[in-house]
């Protein structure tokens, strides 16, 4: 839930920050993109360390980075400081998200993996919904800085909880010195009722993996397709979540109504994610995700072009969230299944990182496109088009039956 709030806190605060500092749309776009840029670097640069030091260690490190970034953001005095601190916070979120995705996937069986990932990633829209509700109260009573302070406080609380309760990945421990981790593995196996779980006495050292490995012949097609899927989906998704509240306010709605649309979008996302997770036990996750991406195009076009009442507007926002966030859950389910344990977080991190680059470009480009005079309704069509590419790319991915 933390990443949902931390990522979107700038979107919730955008109108208030722009008013206080008299910012242009393009400057707001930079602030919205700064955190996403940090997430991209964190996913690409920090995430691979989870394949070296462990998933748990990286999650704890990233939680500390997020906490510092959020508290410092609350004290920022100008747009440059805030952009830099949003970048720092994004570093932590990017590394943590990739490590957690691998950790949950590795603790899930093949039948329930889709639902497990759906539950994990539903924390994002839940955090966004909760954050949106809290933001309405905090903005009205304490100003935009209180949003960042609240986020920092929530992150700080999670550090000791994660330290005491978060387990290390068995898959990761099996890659190193098994004798060193024998007791930990045995205790985890016992907690999971794997009574007959046996540990080989031979040590299987992980083969050194690099980003070049992702493009070897056996991974190349799937790697390129998952990269395209992440980039295009994040490009469209972060336009929607970053700009929808502000565009609605600019169109005449109140700030509360604009934030409410963002909340409805995330609520639809939770339903879409859970339904996709349920269906993955019966249908191929690549096919389901491709269909979700295609239907996302139609939902964005309808939202942009239709002349809707307030109630219809909120319903269509929910529909966009249903398909966009549902498709995102599909990608998070697919990515871990492409790579072996020794390469898994590196592969996931690279895919998420490239996706974040799309997410960086979207809010930034949207600011300049809107300044150029493009109508708000037309902007939804422009940013829906990449989803067609994503749908085709994900359809091409071929997965093995098990998570090796």
Residue ranges and their predicted role:
Residues 114-140, 154-155, 352-362:
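Glycine-rich segments within core transmembrane alpha-helices of 12-TM secondary carriers
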Residues 140-152, 370-385:
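A membrane-interface helix-boundary motif in multi-pass transporters
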Residues 144-204, 392-404:
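Central mid-sequence intracellular linker of multi-pass
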Residues 216-273:
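Extracytoplasmic gate region of multi-pass secondary transporters
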């Amino acid at each position: 839930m933390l990443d949902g709030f931390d990522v979107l806190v700038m979107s919730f605060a955008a109108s208030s920050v722009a008013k206080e500092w008299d910012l242009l749309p393009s400057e707001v776009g930079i602030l919205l993109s700064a955190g996403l840029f940090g997430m991209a670097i964190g996913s690409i640069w920090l995430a691979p360390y989870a394949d070296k030091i462990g998933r748990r260690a990286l999650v704890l490190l990233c939680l500390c980075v997020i906490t510092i970034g959020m508290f410092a953001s609350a004290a920022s005095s100008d747009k440059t400081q805030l952009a830099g601190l949003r970048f720092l916070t994004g570093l932590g979120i990017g590394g943590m998200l990739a490590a957690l995705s691998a950790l949950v996937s590795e603790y899930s069986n093949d039948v329930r993996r889709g639902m497990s990932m759906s539950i994990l990633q539903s924390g994002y829209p839940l955090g966004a919904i909760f954050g949106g509700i809290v933001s309405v109260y905090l903005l009205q009573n304490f100003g935009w800085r209180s949003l960042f302070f609240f986020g920092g406080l929530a992150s700080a609380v999670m550090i000791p909880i994660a330290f005491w309760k978060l387990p290390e990945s068995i898959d990761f421990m099996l890659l190193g010195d098994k004798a060193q981790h024998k007791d930990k593995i045995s205790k985890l196996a016992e907690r999971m009722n794997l009574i007959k779980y046996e540990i080989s006495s031979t040590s299987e050292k992980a083969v050194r993996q690099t980003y070049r490995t992702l493009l070897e012949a056996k991974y190349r097609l799937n790697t390129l397709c998952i990269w395209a899927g992440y980039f295009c989906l994040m490009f469209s998704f972060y336009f929607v979540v970053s700009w929808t509240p502000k565009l609605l306010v600019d169109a005449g709605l109140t700030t509360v109504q604009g934030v409410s649309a963002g909340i409805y979008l995330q609520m639809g996302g939770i339903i879409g994610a859970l339904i996709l997770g349920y269906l993955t036990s019966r249908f191929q996750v690549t096919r389901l995700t491709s269909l979700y991406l295609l239907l996302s195009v139609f939902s964005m076009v309808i939202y942009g072009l239709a002349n809707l009442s307030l109630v219809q507007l909120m319903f269509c926002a929910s529909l966009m969230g249903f398909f966009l966030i549902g498709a995102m859950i599909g990608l998070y389910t697919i990515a871990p299944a492409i790579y072996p344990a020794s390469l898994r977080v590196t592969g996931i991190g690279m895919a998420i990182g490239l996706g974040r680059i799309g997410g960086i470009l979207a809010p930034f480009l949207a600011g300049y496109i809107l300044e150029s005079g493009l109508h708000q309704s037309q902007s939804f069509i422009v940013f829906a088009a990449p989803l067609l590419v994503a749908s085709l790319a994900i359809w091409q991915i071929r997965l093995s039956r098990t998570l090796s």
